[in-house]
Swiss-Prot record:
Alphabetized Pfam families for the sequence: Ribosomal_S10
NCBIfam families xrefs: PRK00596.1 (NF001861), rpsJ_bact (TIGR01049)
Species the sequence originates in: Trieres chinensis
Gene designation per UniProt: rps10
Location, primary (coarse class): plastid
Record protein name field: Small ribosomal subunit protein uS10c
Leader sequence segment: none
SUPFAM superfamilies registered for this protein in UniProt: Ribosomal protein S10
Length: 103
């Protein structure tokens, strides 16, 4: 008799475009649900917002400035699965697998 244990994969996705990130999460969740994974959860992380201040004039006029903003949207997908089943993960985006936890 074979004893099955559950394992967990945590996948972190980052993107500057939140619509692209949402579609990537949807594609990954559709792929995982078609396989034999037992549970899937998508968690939204706080958005990093960086503001850069640039002087417009090269010499004087410090009052004249421009502000640029860069936002990084993040999601974490946790996949609970049976270790004997191999899951396919879409690799079109920047994906980092932080940890594989087996319990």
């Amino acid at each position: 008799m074979e004893i099955k244990t559950n394992a967990k994969i945590r996948v972190r996705l980052e993107s500057f475009n939140h619509e692209l990130l949402t579609s990537a999460c949807r594609k990954i969740s559709d792929t995982i649900q078609n396989s034999d994974a037992t549970k899937l959860s998508v968690v939204s992380l706080p958005t990093d917002k960086r503001i850069y201040c640039v002087l417009r004039s090269p010499h004087v006029d410090k009052d004249s400035r421009e502000h640029f903003e860069l936002r990084v949207h993040k999601r974490v997908i946790e996949i609970y699965y049976d270790p004997t089943v191999k899951c396919r993960i879409i690799s079109k985006f920047r994906i980092t697998v932080r940890s594989i936890i087996s319990y």
